[in-house]
From Swiss-Prot:
Keyword field contains Plastid: yes
Protein localization: Plastid, Chloroplast
GO biological process: mitochondrial translation
Main subcellular location: plastid
PANTHER family from the UniProt entry: 50S/60S RIBOSOMAL PROTEIN L16 (PTHR12220), LARGE RIBOSOMAL SUBUNIT PROTEIN UL16M (PTHR12220:SF13)
Assembly: Part of the 50S ribosomal subunit.
Family classification: Belongs to the universal ribosomal protein uL16 family.
Organism, as annotated: Lepidium virginicum
Alphabetical list of Pfam families matching this protein: Ribosomal_L16 (PF00252)
Keywords, comma-separated and alphabetical: Chloroplast, Plastid, Ribonucleoprotein, Ribosomal protein
NCBIfam families in UniProt: rplP_bact
Protein name listed in UniProt: Large ribosomal subunit protein uL16c
Any one GO molecular-function label of the UniProt entry: structural constituent of ribosome
């Protein structure tokens, strides 16, 4: 699972997801990509599940690039705990994505294989996405 080696602070505010992605919204490495259409938090487990599904489908032929990294800690309080006594402890890591952000890129495979692999990865994501091809 992906997570930062070290961070400056253990806990973060939740923040809000407004606007569209101004960075990481163009294909840079591969020929095909999976692009988000909604704002969301994507957990490191979901990122890994999508990556595994794609690499299993492509086998040795192509190359896959993961363009997002989970750098935001999400805290969870223990079950049946009374209110107060501080914020919960960090439980898992998420990547904050806005509409337009590229999640995965792929190259070195025919379009039909890429489309199939990326659609399987898209089904693992908690949001609407689209398949795009670089010109």
């Amino acid at each position: 699972m992906l997570s930062p080696k070290r961070t400056r602070f253990r806990k973060q505010h939740r923040g809000r997801l407004k606007g569209i992605s101004s960075r990481g919204n163009r294909i840079c490495f591969g020929r095909y990509a999976l692009q988000t259409l909604e704002p969301a938090w994507i957990t490191s487990r979901q990122i890994e599940a999508g990556r595994r599904a794609m690499s299993r489908n492509v086998r040795r032929g192509g190359k896959i690039w993961v363009r997002i990294f989970p750098d935001k800690p999400v805290t969870v309080r223990p079950a049946e705990t009374r209110m107060g006594s501080g914020k919960g402890s960090p439980e898992y890591w998420v990547a904050v994505v806005k509409p337009g952000k590229i999640l995965y890129e792929m190259g070195g495979v025919p379009e039909n294989i890429a489309r199939k692999a990326i659609s399987i990865a898209a089904s693992k994501m908690p949001i609407k996405t689209q398949f795009i091809i670089s010109e």
